[in-house]
Amino acid sequence: MATISDAEALSKLNFEFNGGDKRPVSEIIKCLNSNNECVAVATLMNEVIGFGCAQSFKSFCYNEAYGEITEMYVKKSARRNGVATSLISFLENQLHSRGVKSIKILTGRDNNSAIKVYELSGYVMDDEVMLMKELE
């Protein structure tokens, strides 16, 4: 699991991943300390080379909690070495310990390398459609 000492590295990796404004380290620390989010990091020689995030949800509509892997990023130089697969497995175990029985992952329809990793980890595509609306 990520710790506050990983916050600076997470800020840099998130910027590589999402672009836009770099997330302040103080905000990352606040999230790590108070959120329902599981944040996993992968390291190589004491350097954070990837991260994955997951959340669990419980609704009165369903008997069991469900989870979602919301973010997954591995530095380009560290890809194709099983890092993402290890992060997925770790997050699955964390969610399972919270009582989660099923996990969703959302990724871009053209992100073929990510889709392949998820499928190799046992995930299957379904026919759901995601809709989004920006609120002002």
Residues covered by each model-derived region:
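Conserved acetyl-CoA-binding loop-helix of GNAT-fold acetyltransferases
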Residues: E71-V74, R80-N93, K116-L120
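Residue-level recognition of the GNAT/N-acetyltransferase active site
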Residues: F57, K75, R79, G108
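Conserved GNAT acetyl-CoA-binding A-motif
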Residues: I88, L95-T107
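Conserved active-site alpha-helix within GNAT-family acetyltransferase domains
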Residues: T85, K101, R109-D127, M132-K133
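Acetyl-CoA-dependent GNAT
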Residues: I4-E64, T70, M125, E134
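Hydrophobic adenine-recognition pocket in adenosine-nucleotide-binding enzymes
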Residues: A2, M72-V74, T107
